[in-house]
């Protein structure tokens, strides 16, 4: 699921470490499986990244200029991407409760999530030696300041799989798209 954002703050250590992203998109992701399906491969993950980056649905990325034709994230390389693992997307209502039987096993989901984030960073040209596992700059001087508005800067920031996803974000409106890839 994609959600447009003006800026976002995501908790990555269950306590007090937040990473920040500027104007761009949040990607909520869950990995589902049914008993008859084959395991999710790197090829399938790369395909999902391609759909994410090449689908022309965004018309609002640049407040400085109006655009008439939808653009893809590929056409807006300066926009930030905030990836949030979101197992609740895999919930199905049964009776009066929600069940999550379609989610892949937690260890499989963690590995798929790490690979997906890696493929997004590679596709966006992020130098992974300069960022930590969440995509935050290793150098404090490169990190956005904790106060004020965050300028977009081609960041690919990701939450920590299995942790509580404390999320704060601002958006110009409910611009949300759901993809089943």
Curated annotation (Swiss-Prot):
One Gene Ontology term, aspect cellular component: cytoplasm
Any Pfam family the entry gives: Tyr_Deacylase
InterPro entries assigned to the protein according to its UniProt record, in alphabetical order: Daa-tRNA_deacyls_DTD, DTD-like_sf
Gene3D superfamilies in UniProt: D-tyrosyl-tRNA(Tyr) deacylase (3.50.80.10)
Gene Ontology MF term list: D-aminoacyl-tRNA deacylase activity
Domain of life: Eukaryota
EC number in record: 3.1.-.-
Location(s), subcellular: Cytoplasm
Keyword entries, A-Z: Cytoplasm, Hydrolase
Main function: May hydrolyze D-tyrosyl-tRNA(Tyr) into D-tyrosine and free tRNA(Tyr). Could be a defense mechanism against a harmful effect of D-tyrosine.
Assembly description: Homodimer.
Family assignment from sequence similarity: Belongs to the DTD family. Highly divergent.
Descriptive protein name: Putative D-tyrosyl-tRNA(Tyr) deacylase 2
